């Protein structure tokens, strides 16, 4: 654990950064406290293919670079093949899950306890109406539809 604050971990694809991502990151940062740390795990390209069943729009190094340069973010790491491995390496005090992330809080808590980690798990609400997929649909509608 950090000296005064807490280490909060957030994980995601962060393919097209939008308002909801920024608000979610600020919310997660507030859980860390003044001297805490927000660590963002950016999904590997192979995990985007595996879990989202699609190609990433931007490659992992670009997504990590963009997230690293967002104000609330203290540190960025690329994820592991097994998402639990990232948690074991980072040893966060808190995992902040997005409203739409696949992980069930109880299952995740139990899996981590089996491995000796007692981590607080928080499910964050949806922030705004933006989503990466809605942005993609809008771009297709505006620029790819034949009229």
Curated annotation (Swiss-Prot):
Its cofactor is a divalent metal cation. This is FAD synthase. GO terms for biological process: FAD biosynthetic process; FMN metabolic process. Belongs to the archaeal FAD synthase family. Pathway: Cofactor biosynthesis; FAD biosynthesis; FAD from FMN: step 1/1. It is an enzyme of class 2 (transferase). Catalyzes the transfer of the AMP portion of ATP to flavin mononucleotide (FMN) to produce flavin adenine dinucleotide (FAD) coenzyme. Keywords: ATP-binding, FAD, Flavoprotein, FMN, Nucleotide-binding, Nucleotidyltransferase, Transferase. SUPFAM superfamilies: Nucleotidylyl transferase (SSF52374). It catalyses: FMN + ATP + H(+) = FAD + diphosphate. It comes from the Archaea. Its EC number is 2.7.7.2. HAMAP family: FAD_synth_arch. Homodimer. InterPro entries: Archaeal_FAD_synthase, Cyt_trans-like, FAD_synth_RibL, Rossmann-like_a/b/a_fold. GO terms for molecular function: ATP binding; FMN adenylyltransferase activity. ATP binds at residues 13-14, 18-21, 100, 127.
């Amino acid at each position: 654990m950090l000296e005064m604050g807490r280490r909060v971990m957030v994980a995601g694809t962060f393919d097209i950064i939008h308002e909801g991502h920024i608000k979610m990151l600020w919310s997660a940062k507030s859980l860390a406290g003044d001297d805490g740390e927000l660590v963002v795990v950016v999904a590997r390209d192979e995990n985007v293919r595996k879990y989202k069943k699609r190609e990433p729009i931007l490659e992992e190094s670009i997504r990590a670079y963009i997230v690293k340069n967002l104000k609330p973010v203290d540190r960025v790491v690329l994820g592991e093949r097994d998402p639990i491995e990232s948690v074991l390496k980072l040893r966060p005090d808190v995992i902040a899950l997005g409203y739409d992330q696949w992980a069930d809080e109880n299952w995740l808590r139990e899996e981590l306890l089996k491995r000796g980690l007692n981590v607080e798990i928080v499910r964050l609400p949806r922030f705004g109406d933006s989503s990466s997929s809605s942005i993609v649909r809008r771009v297709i509608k505006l620029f790819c539809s034949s009229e």
